[in-house]
Curated annotation (Swiss-Prot):
GO terms for cellular component: plasma membrane. Involved in the transport of copper. One of its GO terms (molecular function) is copper ion transmembrane transporter activity. InterPro entries: Cop_transporter. This is Copper transporter 5.1. It is a multi-pass membrane protein. The lineage of its organism: Eukaryota, Viridiplantae, Streptophyta, Embryophyta, Tracheophyta. It is found in: Membrane. Keywords: Copper, Copper transport, Ion transport, Membrane, Transmembrane, Transmembrane helix, Transport. Belongs to the copper transporter (Ctr) (TC 1.A.56) family. SLC31A subfamily. The keyword Ion transport applies. The keyword Ribonucleoprotein does not apply. Coiled coil: none annotated. Pfam families: Ctr (PF04145).
């Protein structure tokens, strides 16, 4: 019978029938594996965001307007999306892998075991701290390194 409320114990089925824990050693190794998978989820998300930002950092093919034409210049410059297909495919692939891993972590938490829940949450927090909480959170890729631009 599947649990419908949180419980604490070493006997848990995680994701499928082949991943059952009956000993404390197996249970603790499973919790470590879930913690590492959760941290890896955060790493993949940070990597996907960096790839997406770096792919969009290519300079525009249209030069900036002269100061006299600034009032008539378009607000958005057209981007050349033709050369960005490999980067778009890479970010889509990373998004798919990351989504799949996220859903697997959600299903593991749905075992309603308290240790599994804590391991996933601690892994997500540790991964966020390690890979996504730096000052580059609001990372903006600038094509012109001049501070006055």
């Amino acid at each position: 019978m599947m649990h419908m409320t949180f419980y604490w114990g070493k006997d848990v089925t995680i994701l499928f029938d082949g991943w059952r824990t009956a000993t404390w050693t197996g249970y603790l190794l499973s919790l470590v594996a879930l913690l590492l998978a959760s941290a890896f989820y955060q790493y993949l998300e940070a990597f996907r965001i960096r790839v997406k930002l770096l792919a969009g950092a290519k300079p525009a093919s249209i030069p900036p307007p002269a100061s006299s034409d600034a009032a008539r210049a378009p607000l958005l410059l057209p981007s050349s999306a033709a050369g960005r297909w490999p980067a778009r495919l890479a970010t889509a692939g990373l998004f798919g892998v990351n989504s799949g891993l996220g859903y697997l972590l959600m299903l593991a938490v749905m075992s309603f075991n308290g240790g599994v829940f804590v391991a996933v949450v601690v892994g997500l927090a540790a991964g966020y701290l390690a890979f996504r909480s730096s000052d580059g959170e609001d990372l903006v890729v600038v094509d012109n390194p001049c501070a006055c631009a």
